[in-house]
Amino acid sequence: MRRILFFSLLLLAIAAEAQTARKFTINLTDDGAAQMVVFLPANPSGKAIVGVPGGGYSVLSNTHEGTQWSDWLNQQGIAYFVVNYRLPNGDRSIPISDVEKGIRIVRDSAALWHIHPHDVGIMGFSAGGHLSSVISTLSDFDVRPDFTILFYPVISMDERVSHKYSCINFLGEEGHKDPALVKKYSTQNAVKRHLTPPAIIIMASDDRLVPPVTNGVAYYSAMRNAGNECAMYIYPTGDHGFGCGPWFKYHDQMLSDLGNWLNNRKTPKADALRVACIGNSITDGHGIDMADQHGYPALLQQKLGNDYWVKNFGVSGRTLLNKGDMPYMNETAWRDALAFDPDIVVIKLGTNDSKPQNWQYKAEFKKDLQQMLTSLCPQLATPSKKKGKKARQALPTRPKIYLCTPIPAFKSSWNINEDVIANEIIPIQQEVAQEYGLEVIDLHTLFANDSDKVQDDGIHPNDKGVRRMADIIADAIKKQ
């Protein structure tokens, strides 16, 4: 009987090992002080996860919070990369740059390693969870992960409600006393609507080392308040640091929960046409709960289907005018939209520009619109129409840009001025569109009799309104 049991366990071990086709190590620094251990699956699904072990920014717990995850992840077809980052010793840029470099290598090597470059997640534990949340919220678009897995994460850098030594080791002896740095790197404060990737948070309720409520729960709350996709699993017991350890009472349930979350994540097709929705609160989804799933860009994704990949880059209150009170082109969302490298762009700006404090700079509206267009598509730097001549047929350009006129302002909420929109802003948009050979989607005319499709403020579309917007814009895109 013992012999049968021995051989059964041996076969299971061999089967698990067989799920990993290749294992090797890459130096992230010339001296090898930072390394990335690579586990490539035998049957790749295209998904990849970059692992970030914990250890309070003083050591690396890179077994049960690192390499031991390789068998289970490779069995799911997930490529796994453990970053053994350098410790900060007060210089937070050191571990940040190591993890960013790891993600960049994974994306740059995606074709070679059979990975979808936009299905690369990050998985961090404890202090490594904090580092993962920093990358997810504060890093540039090209190294920001597509999804985030946080195990019992340190989130707050306020040592009074967090893990004291993680705060000191990350920010430094002087830095952890600086309120501005504490606020910046307490990553619940850095969550951005639409831009921070979907997350799953896994903790035990009896964690005595990193308080769940002021850390993992705080990150979940920030994500939910922003309308971003986020799940949280809190198990009754387990304390801190269980990782992939089989001693964790809820180990099997945890793997099932995590596996289901990963399996339900939708990945864009590799050749999908990228659609960037640029705009103000109407694009952002003001007044639409969970706008990332129910705003007009999300509905546009549903209507266009899997051959398109739609992303929401809307930011509430923003102006096209660079001298406006909140210029769109100063935003992270604008930089992300450019880095997204879209095939199609839908621009829906102008409503906030009509406010008196902004429209005093109306002489610059055309120039700023031209700046936005030529930044998106440098080919447009030479307009398709010379002054005084008929517009000629525009040459094909990438991205294809659609200019949307603002929907009517049925009320003057926030000093938004319908007369300025109708008689000054829209004519400039139409003039520029003609000069550059762009298509105008005239939402202003199409919504003229649709006061029932806006919220009580008379400005923002309600659920019916965002569906109508998505229908109109999808029809325009599909005609091409």
Question: What does each of the following model-derived ranges do?
Answer:
Residues 37, 92, 217-268, 456-459, ...:
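C-terminal catalytic histidine-bearing segment of alpha/beta-hydrolase fold enzymes
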Residues 200-207:
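Short beta-strand/loop motif that positions the catalytic acidic residue
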